[in-house]
Amino acid sequence: MELDAKLDLNVVAVDSGETVHLLLELEAPGLEGERRRDPANLQVVLDRSGSMGDGSLLAALQAIDSLVGKLSPDDQLGLVCFDDSVIVPIAAGPVGDGGAIRSALRHIHTGGMTNLSSGLMRGIQEADRASADRAATLVLLSDGHANEGVTDHPTLEGVAKGATGHKITVSTIGIGHGYDEDLLEAISRGGGGNSHFAENGDEAGAHLAGEVEGLLEQVIQAASLTVKPTGDVSGIRLYNDLPTSEIKDGFMVELGELVSEEKRRLLF
């Protein structure tokens, strides 16, 4: 792990009570030797029907935004959204610097009914197109019941099963207590993936992150940073929204997992 610390002040007068800010930059090591992981292929299929307006859609979009920072420029990411129709805000392709993806996320809003089948089928098409015969993971998030298009459970399970023949794994995340649990379980069963229940949009984002972790090669797990101020420091504050715990003479910041060459910034 490489660390670089920068202060906003070079000199502080003794007993001045000055506030000093510290920017700590961390970079995880790269993979050893010549071994590099293959580009990950992730396709997200997101319900944007009217019922997702309770905050679930926003939380899911924020989760996707945070995932962009964990993906490498050559990783593939695509997003298909559905209500009573299907849109492709992010055509499956390389992440690049993430700017275009984040811009597209800001323009996604809730719509009408729930044509889940069209969203699933379009997502599979995108994943197959972009993966170039490599493995891909499709994650479908929904909070409701399919009420337009194909709604038959065995048929949709068969659609997901057909995707596995193209090296596409299909997982599902059901949000809240009103979604069709049997349908999403059937789809994930057919697609050879996982079926998750999320109490709310924030939990859905956590499950989505968990699915992505399986695609990425982690070089550091359960990382933490110990902060122990000297006697000359009267107080310290972490501006990042990260879990912390008190220890003797300081506190510990939980950083979690870091992938190859991932960069983090902490502001104190």
Can you name each region flagged by the protein language model?
Residues 6-222:
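Exposed acidic/Ser/Thr-rich ligand/metal-binding surfaces
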Residues 22-24, 32-43, 224-227, 233-268:
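An acidic, Ser/Thr-enriched
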